[in-house]
Structures are given as C-alpha cells and as structure tokens.
Amino acid sequence: MTKTKIIFMGTPQFAATVLKGLIDSNQYEILAVVTQPDRKVGRKQELRMTPVKELALTVNLPVLQPEKLSGSVEMTQIMTLLESGEVGIVTAAFGQFLPGKLLDVAQFAVNTHASLLPKYRGGAPIHYAIMNGEKEAGVTIMEMIRKMDAGDMIAQDSTPILEDDNVGTMFEKLALVGRDLLLETLPKYLSGQLKAQAQNEDEVTFSPNISPEEEKIDWNKSAREIFNKVRGMNPFPVAHTTWNGERFKIYETKVVDDSVGNLQAGEIVEKTKKSLKVATGEGLLELLFVQPAGKPKMDIVSFLNGLGQKIQVGDKFGD
C-alpha cells in the first residue's frame, strides 16, 4: 500500500495525540513535523519542548520550529517538500497562521479544530465553550483556506462537557475524538468518498486567544458564570483575583445555592476550618483549590491552615 505523504503541524498535547494516531496507523509517510519553538515555562523558566516535538524525536521524525513561518528558512524547507509532489498538510492546534502559498502548493490541507464549527473559530475554542456554559464540545475536520477556520467541513464529532470538566480534561477527551475522527475520515476524503460541506456563516462565533484582562474574575458576575470561567481557564491560563494587593489564582470552585442577601460582590461571607465562601453578583461561590502569590497550588484546607488564617469574614477579594 502506498502511504500518503504529509507534513504535520501542531504544538500542544492535543496535537501530539493526533500525530501519534497518524504514526500508529501506518498509512502516512510523515516527511516533517512543524511545531512552535521551545519556550521557557514555569516559575523556574526552564526551556521546554512542545509535546509534538517530544513525540517526533522519539520516532526520529525531522522537526522544524519556525518562530514565524512567513519568510523563514523553515518555510523554504517546507515548500521544497511540498513541491516534491503529492504531499499534503495536516494540522492540529499549530498556533500559527499558514501562509497562502503553502496552501496553494499542498496537494491537500486539513485542520483538526477543537470546536463544532462554525462556532468558536480561533485559538481558544475549548476555553470559550466551557466559559460560556456549553453542554457539549467537539472536533471538526476541515479544509484549510486563507481565512481562519473558515474552510469547508469534512466531518464532525461531539462529546458532553460535564460539570466537573475543565480545559485540561476536555483537551484530553477532544484529542481522542479528533484523532479517531481524522483517522476515520481522512482516507475517505482523499479518495473522494466524503465531500466537504460549507459552514453556515450566519452561525459563526469566535474564540480568540485569552487576553490577560479576561483572566481576571469579575465578582459582580453570577456564581455560575464565575464557576464556568474558573474551570474554563484551569489548568491554563488560570483565572485570578487579588488578595492583600497580590494576585490570587483560583483553580476550582463550587456554586452554592444560598440566597446572598445584601452583600458586596467579592466579600467573604463564611469561613470555617474547611471552607471559604464568597459573595458574587448572584449566589455564593465556595473556593476549593487556590494559589496565593509566590506559593504552589493548594486545596482550600491547606490555605486556611496557613496564609488563609489571616482572612476574615467581611474581607473582600478583588480591587
């Protein structure tokens, strides 16, 4: 059987799961893997490879890491590979816009996008689906065109978003959905069995990358909205407020259905040895996992036994 030649482009674990599926299927000859450059991460600022690069190196695939594709040496290398004939591009959460001339030369170009298009075009579809309280999320296999995430759709599959899901758990679930959907549908698409369908432009919504401003918790929102925001940013970039003038990250919360009464949003209304409840614009929110400035992530009991001993009912989170 002749293997389909492809160049794979992707960056996070979501993309690594898709790449592993392509490798294991033994149907594809992967000429190169393109991923983001190594980045410094964490408090120690250690240089870290992307999950896609880590996987590619374990199976001796050539890795290209352009800071930006346009005008790069790597772009020239990719063009040379594409011009060698009958080579396609497969992407999954690559994190860069593909120059049009790559799309022009590639035999085909398909993207594994983590949303039920036309909803949530852009770089943070899973975050927004959770933050907006959606009951399901999904993956779309789509043709790539010059406009972001606007190409015709080849296939779609969905999975429920449960109450205890967050960005991390949904990334894991959707990576498997995306992997299986791509492996099932790409051969049918390339053979002409599957025809791509246009997106309904009237139903388009966007999910741009999360800005630092959006990471801040607005305590005037309802407890449910803040609950969704917190899990829609856990484990990254992490929602935060301020306490004692310093950043205070919140990883996990629980909506408490008590009537709030005449309390100020952000005010601490109940403190025990094991729990901390905060007033919001509507309802109470119980904090479960937090991270004070300069400290590791901890459960609320650990916080209350340490730094949190200072916190009092009537104190306020936020500016």
UniProtKB/Swiss-Prot annotation:
Keywords: Protein biosynthesis, Transferase. It is an enzyme of class 2 (transferase). The gene is fmt. CDD domains: FMT_core_Met-tRNA-FMT_N, Met_tRNA_FMT_C. NCBIfam families: fmt. It holds the Pfam family Formyl_trans_C. The keyword Transferase applies. One of its GO terms (molecular function) is methionyl-tRNA formyltransferase activity. Its EC number is 2.1.2.9. It comes from the Bacteria. Signal peptide: none annotated. This is Methionyl-tRNA formyltransferase. It catalyses: L-methionyl-tRNA(fMet) + (6R)-10-formyltetrahydrofolate = N-formyl-L-methionyl-tRNA(fMet) + (6S)-5,6,7,8-tetrahydrofolate + H(+). InterPro entries: Fmt, Formyl_trans_C, Formyl_trans_C_sf, Formyl_transf_N, Formyl_transf_N_sf, Formyl_transferase-like_C_sf, Met-tRNA-FMT_C, Met-tRNA-FMT_N. (6S)-5,6,7,8-tetrahydrofolate binds at S115, L116, L117, P118. The keyword Protein biosynthesis applies.
